C-alpha cells in the first residue's frame, strides 16, 4: 500500500510516494485511512475477493506509519499465512454471508458505529463444469452484494464486530440491531416497466459503458425501449445490453420483443447473465432456411452450446420472452399476446 498527499486546490497529487505497508504473505487492497482519538487507522480488505475474503485494521500515531496490525485470539487462523481479519467468512462455509470483507464505516449522530461490506450468498449447487478453473467452489448467481454490521470500539481502541452478549467473533451476522435514528425506507421498486418515463430507472445497468443515445432510446417510440445493435455477447468492448441485478434465488422476468432480423448475425432477446463467459440467452435471429427463429445460447466458461434447435416464430409479430428461476433451475418460455406461453429448453 502506498500513500501520497493530495492537493485539493490544484486537484493533483503532490510530494513523495511512500510505501506504508508491504505484505509478506497477505494481499491488502481498497485501503481507507481515518483518524480517531489521535490514531490513524488503516482499514483494508484482505486475501482477494473469493471465499477467503476479509477485512483488517491497522493503526499508527503518524499517518506515514509505521502501522500496527490488530491481532486477537478470536481471529481464527489455520496458518501463519492467513490475515488477521476483524470480519471474514473464511473457514465458515455454513453461514449465509460468504466472501465477506472490503468494509467502509460510518458513525451515526448518536455515536453508534456501523460497517458496510461486500459479501455473496452461495447457491446450493457446486460447479461441476468449473473443476479446472474453480475446483470445489460454489456458484454465486446473485453476484456481489452489500451487507451491514454493527461495530464497537474496544477499550484498547480497536474496531470490532458488536456481538452483543455473545462471545467476540469476526463472522458476519444476518441480523443486526438498527441505529437509533429515524427510518428512511427506500421506495419499492416496481415489478413492471412500460418505459413511459424519459429516462431509465436507476435499477437498470449497462455493461462496461454508460447508457446513452448511441444505443438506446426511450423517445424514438414512446412506451418502448429501443436498442441499437453493437458487438456480440462474447465481446469485451461495446455491447447493447440493459439488465437488472438478480435480488432473489427465485423470480420471474419477461419482456415483449419486436425484432425483425435480416441476417443470422443479428440477434436480440432475454439474457440471464453472470459474466461475459457465463450466461443463458433466449434470443431471436434468422436462419437462412427457416426464417425468423428462436433458440437458446448457453455459455459456460466460454464453452458455447445450443441446448435446443431453431424454432420458427411469426414474422412481423412481437414475441414474449420469459424466464422462471427457481434456485439452480431456469426455464424459458416464449409466445404471443393473448396466448399461453410455450416452454423452450
Language-model-derived ranges and their functions:
Residues 1-345:
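Carbohydrate-active catalytic/glycan-binding domains of CAZyme proteins
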Amino acid at each position: 500500500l502506498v500513500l501520497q498527499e493530495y492537493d485539493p486546490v490544484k486537484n493533483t497529487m503532490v510530494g513523495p510516494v511512500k510505501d506504508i505497508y508491504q505484505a509478506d504473505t497477505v494481499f491488502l487492497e481498497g485501503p481507507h485511512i481515518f483518524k480517531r482519538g489521535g490514531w490513524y487507522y488503516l482499514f483494508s480488505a484482505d486475501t482477494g475477493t473469493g471465499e477467503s475474503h476479509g477485512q483488517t485494521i491497522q493503526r499508527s500515531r503518524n499517518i506515514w506509519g509505521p502501522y500496527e496490525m490488530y491481532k486477537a485470539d478470536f481471529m481464527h487462523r489455520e496458518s501463519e499465512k492467513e490475515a488477521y481479519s476483524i470480519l471474514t467468512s473464511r473457514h465458515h462455509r455454513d453461514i449465509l454471508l460468504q466472501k465477506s470483507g472490503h468494509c467502509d464505516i460510518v458513525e451515526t449522530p448518536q455515536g453508534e458505529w456501523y460497517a458496510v461490506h461486500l459479501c455473496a450468498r452461495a447457491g446450493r449447487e457446486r460447479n461441476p463444469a468449473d473443476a479446472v478453473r474453480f475446483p470445489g467452489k460454489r456458484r454465486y448467481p446473485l453476484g456481489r452484494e452489500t451487507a451491514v454490521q454493527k461495530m464497537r470500539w474496544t477499550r484498547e481502541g480497536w474496531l470490532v464486530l458488536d456481538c452483543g452478549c455473545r462471545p467476540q467473533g469476526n463472522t458476519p451476522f444476518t441480523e443486526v440491531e438498527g441505529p437509533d435514528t429515524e427510518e428512511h425506507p427506500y421506495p419499492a421498486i416496481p415489478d413492471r416497466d412500460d418505459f413511459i418515463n424519459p429516462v431509465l430507472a436507476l435499477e437498470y445497468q449497462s455493461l462496461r459503458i454508460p447508457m446513452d443515445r448511441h444505443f438506446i432510446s426511450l423517445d424514438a417510440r414512446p412506451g418502448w425501449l429501443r436498442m441499437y445493435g453493437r458487438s456480440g455477447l462474447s465481446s469485451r468492448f461495446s455491447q447493447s445490453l440493459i439488465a437488472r441485478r438478480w435480488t432473489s434465488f427465485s423470480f420471474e422476468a419477461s419482456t415483449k420483443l419486436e425484432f425483425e432480423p435480416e441476417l443470422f448475425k443479428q440477434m436480440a432477446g432475454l439474457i440471464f447473465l453472470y459474466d461475459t463467459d457465463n450466461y443463458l440467452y433466449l434470443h431471436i435471429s434468422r436462419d437462412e432456411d427457416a426464417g425468423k427463429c428462436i433458440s437458446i445460447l448457453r455459455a459456460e466458461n466460454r464453452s458455447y452450446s445450443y441446448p435446443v434447435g431453431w424454432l420458427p416464430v411469426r414474422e412481423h409479430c412481437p414475441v414474449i420472452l420469459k424466464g422462471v428461476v427457481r434456485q439452480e433451475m431456469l426455464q424459458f418460455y416464449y409466445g404471443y399476446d393473448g396466448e399461453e406461453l410455450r416452454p423452450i429448453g
